[in-house]
């Protein structure tokens, strides 16, 4: 007997059906805004992540050398891949480029609530627009997907920040701005809620801030709770921070217009840990705090395409983690029903396989979503009826030799146990808009 690997999950039909419903809600929301689906490979060159993603990702790579001696990794995230794709065909693509993709990713990290080593995300990205409306649009897609699932603003919140505010503040407060590693300081902010205060301030010190300045910096960013609170930050940070504050205000104003503003709050302690992020960043959390992991995350990465050798191309994206999203939906009581149902079970008795199969085909032709099963194991009448009950068949149609001699089928309602006979030529009826059931013939 072989056990599954730690952090790698199996999904049985009921759970997978619910997961598919959630994925469909996200993709449908993105499709309504004009995002087009792409597909991407499971393997990329390891050097791409070493160069572009940052040390945290690199430490978690499933990396190996292939038979050609190339260093390759199972994809831990999608953004570098889509950046590579944009560079490859950038001149042929109309901008803004709006793509989405749902697929698994792999990171060797500590398994815990909402975190696995194989995990699923739906990435939603816009390339070619630096306007605040692009940031607002991806926020709106995320908000629409969540509300389509039945969640409300009592269930989730987007914490919106700006990395140029954080980096600008660090440089403005530092005794020697040139000695400060702003990316390291921003990574420290990203870890703020995950480590104790002493370790957090130590990380800021390692980035080039003395202890007192690190505390001053943290006091400034943690005091911001509303848009109006940004005034003090702009005053402390100088021109660069003022420009970033103005950009953040514009994004939040656009989010209001897109209908996502009610779900957004300013949170400068949100940073996003990946080095390629540039401007506005955001994370979505369970408002109650019961689900600790972020449900959606995203932001701007305006420099990434150029770093791949392409033309300067602003970009912004968002992605939900399907595992923490499922926890949020379950906590809020909106996780889809995992109980599967079957519209019809065609039960054959005696030598009626051809007739039963023809009827099953006719029933499947009634609609794309109609589920029809029939016996493929040569089982007895009782065994077939028991199986029909186990798959939650709503209607059983008995095709027996004696029934056919009389030119009829027996139609059975599984919920009540009631049944009736129906002339063969009347089941299924021609031109009916609803699926025929026992109640139509009782």
Swiss-Prot record:
GO terms for biological process, alphabetical: histidyl-tRNA aminoacylation
Gene3D superfamilies per record: Anticodon-binding domain, Bira Bifunctional Protein, Domain 2
EC class: ligase
Enzyme Commission code: 6.1.1.21
Disordered: annotated segments: 416-442
Keyword vocabulary terms for this entry: Aminoacyl-tRNA synthetase, ATP-binding, Cytoplasm, Ligase, Nucleotide-binding, Protein biosynthesis
Record field: catalytic activity: tRNA(His) + L-histidine + ATP = L-histidyl-tRNA(His) + AMP + diphosphate + H(+)
Keyword Transport carried by entry: no
A GO CC annotation given for this chain: cytoplasm
PROSITE patterns given in the database record: AA_TRNA_LIGASE_II
CDD domains reported in the protein's UniProt record: HisRS-like_core
Entry similarity comment: Belongs to the class-II aminoacyl-tRNA synthetase family.
Protein name: Histidine--tRNA ligase
Natural source organism: Halorubrum lacusprofundi (strain ATCC 49239 / DSM 5036 / JCM 8891 / ACAM 34)
Gene name per UniProt: hisS
């Amino acid at each position: 007997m072989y056990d599954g690997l730690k952090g790698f999950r199996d999904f049985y039909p009921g759970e997978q059906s619910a997961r598919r419903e959630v994925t469909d809600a996200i993709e449908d929301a993105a499709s309504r805004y004009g995002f087009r689906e792409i597909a991407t490979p499971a393997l990329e060159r390891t050097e791409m992540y070493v160069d572009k993603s940052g040390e945290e990702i690199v430490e978690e790579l499933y990396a190996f050398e292939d038979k050609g001696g190339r260093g390759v990794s199972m994809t831990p995230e999608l953004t570098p891949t889509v950046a590579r794709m944009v560079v490859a065909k950038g001149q042929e693509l109309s901008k803004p480029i709006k793509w989405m993709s749902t697929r698994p990713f792999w990171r060797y990290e500590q398994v815990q609530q909402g975190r696995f080593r194989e995990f699923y995300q739906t990435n939603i990205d816009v390339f070619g627009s630096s306007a605040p409306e692009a940031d607002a649009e991806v926020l709106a897609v995320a908000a629409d997907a969540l509300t389509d699932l039945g969640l409300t603003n009592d269930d989730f919140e987007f914490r919106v920040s700006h990395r140029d505010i954080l980096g600008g503040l660090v440089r403005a407060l530092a005794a020697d701005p040139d000695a400060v590693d702003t990316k390291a300081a921003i990574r420290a902010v990203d870890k703020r809620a995950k480590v104790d205060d002493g370790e957090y301030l130590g990380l800021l010190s390692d980035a080039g801030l003395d202890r007192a300045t690190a505390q001053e910096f943290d006091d400034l960013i943690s005091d911001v709770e509303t848009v109006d609170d940004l005034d003090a930050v702009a005053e402390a940070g100088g021109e660069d921070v003022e420009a970033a504050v103005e950009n953040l205000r514009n994004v939040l104003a656009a989010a209001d217009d897109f209908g996502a503003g009610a779900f957004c709050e300013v949170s400068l302690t949100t940073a996003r840990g990946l080095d390629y992020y540039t401007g506005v960043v955001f994370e979505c959390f369970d408002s109650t705090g019961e689900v600790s992991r972020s449900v959606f995350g995203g932001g701007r990465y305006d420099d990434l395409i150029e770093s791949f050798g392409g033309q300067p191309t602003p970009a912004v994206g968002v992605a939900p983690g399907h595992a923490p999203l499922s926890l949020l939906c379950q906590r809020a009581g909106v996780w889809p029903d995992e109980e599967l149902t079957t519209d019809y079970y065609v039960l054959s008795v005696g030598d009626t396989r051809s007739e039963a199969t023809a009827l099953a085909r006719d029933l499947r032709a009634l609609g794309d979503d109609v589920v029809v099963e029939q016996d493929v194991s040569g089982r007895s009448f009782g065994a077939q009826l028991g199986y029909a009950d186990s798959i939650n068949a709503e209607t059983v149609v008995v095709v027996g030799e004696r029934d056919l001699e009389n030119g009829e089928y027996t139609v059975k309602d599984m919920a009540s146990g009631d049944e009736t006979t129906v002339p063969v030529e009347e089941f299924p009826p021609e031109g009916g808009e609803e699926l025929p059931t026992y109640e139509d013939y009782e």
